[in-house]
Amino acid sequence: MTVKVKLKIILLSCLLLPLVLIAQDETSKKKALNIFTLGDSNGTFPQSWPKQLQTALPNATVFNISKSGRTIGFLNLGDSSLNSLFVIDENLKKAAEATKDRPFDYIVIDLGTNDGKAVFANRQGEVPQNLERLIQKIKSSPYPAVNNAKIIVISPTPYGTKAEATEKYKGGNKRVKKMSKAFKKVAKRTGCLFVNGYKTPGLNIETMTADGLHLDAEGSRLLIEPVLSLMVK
C-alpha cells in the first residue's frame, strides 16, 4: 500500500468518524433504560433534572421520588419524611412495586444541598457517612429490581450569592464544595459512578437560578449531561 493510499484512508476515516459517533449517540438515546431518581427540590419542578433525563432519553422510564427539603440523613424542618435514611426502605418498596419485574438500570442520587444548610454547619462530618449508609441500604435492599442497579451519585451544585445572603444558607457554598470531594471518595469506595455537580460544565449558578439554589431548565439540562454520558456510553 502506497503512502498516498494510506493518507486517503486516514482522511476518509477522519471524515466518517463524526458520522459514526452521531449514529452511536442516536442509538444510545433510543435505549429503553429504566431509571430511578432520588433528589430534593431540584428534582421536583417541571424543568427538573429527572424531567430533563426523560426528555433526553424519550424511550426511558424515569421513576422519580424527589421531595423538596430532602436531606441525606438530617431531620430537616422537623419533618422525618425529609430524611432519606429514615424513609429509604419505604421509597425502595415504592420503586420496586412501580417497576415490578423489570429491574432498574440506574439509580441516580442528587442530594446534599439541604445537608449544607447553616443549621447543620457543625455536623458536616456526618454527611458523607450518611451518604455511604444510604448507598449500602440501597445495595442491600431485598428487591432484586433495585439492588442490582448501577448507582450514580451527583454531588450538590454550588450555592449562589442570593442563597448565601440568607441566614438559612449562609456559608453553604463552602460546605457543598467540600461535599463534592467527599462524595467522590464515597462513590469510589462503594462502587458507584460519580458526577461532580459542583463543577457542572457551563453551569452559572447566578444566572441559571432565581434564588441561588433552584436550577432553571438550562441549568438542569447541563447537570444531567455528564449523567447521560455515563448512561449511553
Task: State the predicted function of each range.
Residues S28-T37, N42-E132:
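Conserved SGNH/GDSL esterase-like catalytic core that processes O-acyl groups on lipids
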Residues I9, K30-K31, E206-T207:
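Short hydrophobic "helix-edge" motifs at membrane interfaces and signal-peptide entry regions
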